[in-house]
Amino acid sequence: LHSLRRRQRQMCIRDRYTITEKHAQDLAEIAEVTGINGLRDLHRQEGFIAPLPEGVMEFGGKMFEISKDGTEGRSSSPNPIDVKRTVDAIREAKMTCEAVLVMVHSHEIRKDNDEEADYFLEEFARACIDAGASAVIGGGTHQLKGIELYRDCPIFYCLGNFIFENQYVRLLPADYMEKYGLNIHTAASIGIARRQEQSSHSLYEIPEVYRSVLPYFEICQGKCTHLELLPVELGMDRENAEKNIPYVADEKTAEKIAEYLTRVSKRYGTEWEYKEGRIVLHA
């Protein structure tokens, strides 16, 4: 194990929203009648905030770039300072270690589902491999995300859940209870039940939340030479006392995990199959 003393902070993410001139005009009109940008505009005039770059407008604290070719959408990128801080640490660790693994915890998503890694995470993970890391292991969201083999090194964008017992927490903060209109002294189990009641698809009803993999991989000369995945399920349909902890998945569930993993890994060109108790790369 190798640890490096570094400034402890979250990685800053830069979101980029691109809209047409017409939509920019619409936002400008809304900002004018609502005053949503009032304080920011005043601070910008007084020099407390940097001027907006040409072709960029602000709305409600978000920056929008006006498209020149009519394309619209969202993208994101990691703060270059944070990337440099991380890759410098990787290179330093490589001086005394045989292999460096990077762990990333992220709840950000690309658009409107939990299956796709955000743009910034892909850029950051590949930068870590470029700097000498042998694998990047992601966690955060409750569902498996795709697995990429980048320069013969695995990037697990998110491994999902392994132990999922948040239904059984004993205490929740006051703001959680207030958010759901409950007394701050309400039992945690009641607070969680209230969240479930008002959800259109509760986490506890989604099979993918209860399915994951346990990776096994071998590294030689900084590269992955062998990779296999143990399919696991967390007992979605079991009784409470046996629920939310990992079990080796049966063959039917394991095949579903392999199919799901192939679908969410499609953008990375990796296909998976279930074979002899393990999920492996499709030959």
Predicted regions and their residues:
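Aromatic/hydrophobic pocket-lining residues that form the small-molecule binding cavity
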Residues: 83-86, 121
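A short C-terminal boundary segment appended to hydrolase-like catalytic domains
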Residues: 14-77, 81, 171-283
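A structural motif corresponding to the C-terminal end of an alpha-helix
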Residues: 89-98, 131-133, 219-224
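Conserved beta-sheet core of the metallophosphoesterase superfamily
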Residues: 117-213
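Generic structural signal for well-ordered alpha-helices
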Residues: 86-91, 125, 214
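Short acidic, glycine-rich surface-loop motifs adjacent to enzyme active sites
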Residues: 60-74, 88-113
